[in-house]
């Protein structure tokens, strides 16, 4: 069996354009996985292998690539940096043991870097920091280090320092080993010399080394005591302390370089091996109860000797067929084995297993705990499903995905395209849990739902190019919701007599606003049997089914509490169906009385703008009903954070680019639902009524 201490499962994540994919390419080149280096500038990289990715120069899917460095196996996942694809970042963090956060030397800590950093903190993933693009105009390593402290609240441990600035950037100083690495102009990563530290940098290097040593020895009380008494720790002792501090998230070893110019990548690879944890050094994944989702107290111990347990974290349909990416947490998996999908209760036989090299694949006959592999041709497996030993059923902690906030109606251009479109969308939904589809029951339209405009643009693009389905695309629609604002007590009787046995159900109930985010909650405090206990679930079912369509404009209803406290029944005519119908009638009767209100999705918006356009940008956000929450002046411009209704953000990127001469950037993610102003609500309700009348 392969020694688990020689495994590293790592992710590379950052803001769009910080250089993640280029960094991954350079890692693959250095580890001998590719011979000609791809380049995002011309759309030829190994991990960006979808047409849409190559064309837009952004990474959409997390491609998994295996490679080797210093006798260690590195499974590298290149994650997308655009906020519409954060679900991919979240998904990959779930299966990683460590990561590299890439920051742009001139852009610094940009909006998406902050979101990804927050996700990684929540997942407790150990990270290295790579400050990239130091050959760029305006690049400043020390300023980015400062931003990491101030904006992310993190402790960077400076491991390398840049030699030269901007176009004169020629190499880096390894602070720990007091060595200078200088590359020639050939652009080849292997063409470097180890030299003495430049004379004008010696004092700076010593100051940073002292800080490095002081921070590192805090991880070992005995070593710290010896250091205080004047004993210099050895390189090996320091490495051990840095490894421990990195694993415990006490600090983040920080490196610098230029991936595009092939400078500084070797030191990052050495650091991955030296400081990031092996699979058996991270907290094992908890096992959960299949029905409640609560942790059982058991864990999936990372060992090849345990029963088989794995998590399916990505489904992909490519030119090779259906691929299910899995991270194996425990046990071994051999070709021909039968495994249980604990989510469906069905078993599947493992046909082909492959190790992915981005768009290439190597056939495998077996895999073990710590491996990230793809299984070919699995049926009925979705993202987040647990695969396990047939004799040892278990469920790993499931993945939770954000709710889509934007939708569009689509239809095939030609009549014969419906079936083709349905099959294609089915595959795409299996691949991306944040992308959803539903059919409008009244119009029969197919509605696609996603995380943002770019997300849906790409999906429509994939349908056209990958699956050959030409579409007619409607206007984006906002996912409004409805709720109530007042608590009321009410009563409703359902009575029907038409020969034979009739229907009778009477309910007395209280209906009131619930806590934000609770959805629908139901309770019964009936005493004395006026509504027999066997009918309570029918009352709950009736109310719950009506939550799908609110009374104002037909949007789903949020955050309502219903308490059944009394009622009446008939020994012959009462039935579950009668009480269910009574609850539906009660909902229709009481919602308007309880002050029904329209809610709209509010987005957390993060805008970067050059300083001379701040006034324009803030004025524009105010016109969009935005609430400015924070403003931070940075190196190259100003970050503005605020809450803005989604309905006001369509087409914003175009406006922002015009206002800032193409230099502005923004990201947004769903924050919460808030009441619509009356003028907006009236417009939305009127439009919904018009559409209903037209149907």
Curated annotation (Swiss-Prot):
Chain ranges of the tr-type G domain: 5-280
GO terms (BP aspect): ribosome disassembly
Superkingdom field: Bacteria
SMART domains, per the entry: EFG_C, EFG_IV
Record PROSITE patterns: G_TR_1, G_TR_2
Residues that, per the record, bind GTP: 14-21, 78-82, 132-135
Keyword vocabulary terms for this entry: Cytoplasm, Elongation factor, GTP-binding, Nucleotide-binding, Protein biosynthesis
Subcellular location field: Cytoplasm
Gene Ontology terms for molecular function: GTP binding; GTPase activity; guanosine tetraphosphate binding; translation elongation factor activity
Keyword Ribosomal protein attributed: no
Function field: Catalyzes the GTP-dependent ribosomal translocation step during translation elongation. During this step, the ribosome changes from the pre-translocational (PRE) to the post-translocational (POST) state as the newly formed A-site-bound peptidyl-tRNA and P-site-bound deacylated tRNA move to the P and E sites, respectively. Catalyzes the coordinated movement of the two tRNA molecules, the mRNA and conformational changes in the ribosome.
Family recorded in the similarity comment: Belongs to the TRAFAC class translation factor GTPase superfamily. Classic translation factor GTPase family. EF-G/EF-2 subfamily.
Name of the protein: Elongation factor G 2
Source organism (scientific name): Aliivibrio fischeri (strain ATCC 700601 / ES114)
């Amino acid at each position: 069996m392969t020694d688990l201490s020689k495994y590293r499962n790592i992710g590379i994540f950052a803001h769009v354009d910080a250089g993640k994919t280029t960094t991954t390419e350079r890692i693959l080149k250095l580890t001998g996985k590719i011979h000609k280096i791809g380049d995002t500038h011309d759309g030829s990289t190994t991990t960006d292998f979808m047409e849409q990715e190559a064309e837009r120069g952004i990474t959409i899917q997390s491609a998994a690539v295996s490679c080797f460095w210093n006798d260690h196996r590195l499974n590298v996942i290149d994650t997308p940096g655009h906020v519409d694809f954060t679900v991919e970042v979240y998904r990959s963090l779930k299966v990683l043991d460590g990561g590299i956060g890439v920051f742009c030397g001139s852009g610094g800590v940009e909006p998406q870097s902050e979101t990804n950093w927050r996700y990684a903190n929540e997942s407790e993933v150990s990270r290295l920091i790579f400050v990239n693009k130091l050959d760029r105009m305006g690049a400043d390593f020390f300023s980015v280090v400062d931003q990491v402290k101030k904006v992310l609240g993190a402790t960077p441990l400076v491991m390398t320092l840049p030699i030269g600035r901007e176009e004169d950037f020629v190499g880096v100083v390894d602070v720990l080993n007091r060595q200078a690495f200088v590359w020639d102009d050939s652009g080849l990563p292997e063409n470097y010399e180890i030299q003495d530290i430049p004379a004008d940098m010696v004092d700076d290097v010593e100051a940073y080394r002292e800080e490095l040593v002081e921070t590192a020895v805090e991880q070992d009380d005995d070593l710290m005591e010896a250091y205080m008494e004047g004993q210099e720790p050895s390189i090996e002792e320091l490495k051990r302390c840095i490894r421990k501090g990195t694993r415990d998230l006490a600090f983040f070893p920080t490196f610098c370089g230029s991936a595009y110019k092939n400078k500084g990548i070797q030191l990052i690879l050495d650091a991955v091996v030296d400081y990031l944890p092996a699979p058996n050094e991270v907290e094992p994944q908890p096992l959960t109860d299949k029905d409640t989702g609560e942790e059982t107290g058991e864990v999936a111990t990372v060992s090849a000797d345990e029963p088989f347990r794995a998590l399916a974290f990505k489904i992909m349909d490519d030119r090779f067929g259906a691929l299910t990416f899995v991270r194996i947490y425990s046990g071994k998996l051999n070709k021909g084995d039968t495994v249980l999908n604990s989510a469906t209760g069905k078993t599947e036989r493992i046909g082909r297993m492959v190790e992915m090299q981005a768009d290439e694949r190597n056939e495998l006959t077996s895999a073990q705990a710590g491996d990230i592999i793809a299984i070919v041709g699995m049926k009925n497996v979705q993202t987040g499903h647990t695969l396990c030993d047939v004799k040892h059923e278990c469920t790993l902690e499931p993945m939770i995905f954000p709710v889509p906030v934007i939708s569009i109606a689509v239809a095939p251009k030609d009549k014969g395209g419906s079936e083709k479109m349905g099959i294609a969308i089915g595959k795409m939904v299996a691949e991306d849990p944040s992308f959803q589809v539903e059919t409008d029951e009244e119009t029969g339209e197919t509605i696609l739902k996603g995380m943002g405009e770019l997300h849906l643009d790409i999906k429509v693009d994939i349908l056209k190019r990958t699956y050959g389905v030409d579409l007619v695309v409607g206007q984006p629609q906002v996912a409004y919701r409805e709720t109530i604002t007042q608590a009321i007590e009410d009563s409703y009787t359902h009575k029907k007599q038409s020969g034979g046995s009739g229907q009778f159900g009477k309910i007395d109930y209280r209906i009131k606003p619930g806590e934000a985010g609770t959805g629908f909650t139901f309770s019964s405090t009936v005493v004395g049997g006026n509504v027999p206990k066997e009918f309570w679930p029918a009352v709950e079912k009736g109310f719950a089914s009506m939550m799908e369509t609110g009374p104002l404009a037909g949007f789903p209803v949020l955050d309502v509490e219903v308490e059944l406290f009394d009622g009446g029944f008939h020994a012959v005519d009462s039935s579950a169906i009668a009480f269910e119908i009574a609850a539906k009638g009660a909902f229709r009767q009481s919602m308007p009385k309880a002050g029904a209100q329209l809610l709209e999705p509010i987005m957390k918006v993060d805008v970067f703008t050059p300083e001379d356009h701040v006034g324009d940008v803030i004025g524009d956000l105010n016109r969009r009903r935005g609430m400015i929450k924070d403003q931070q002046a940075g190196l190259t411009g100003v970050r503005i954070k605020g809450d803005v209704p989604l309905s006001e953000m369509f087409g914003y990127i175009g406006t922002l680019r015009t206002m800032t001469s193409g230099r502005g950037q923004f990201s947004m993610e769903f924050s919460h639902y808030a009441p619509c102003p009356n003028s907006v609500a009236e417009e939305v309700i009127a439009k919904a009524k018009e559409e209903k009348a037209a149907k």
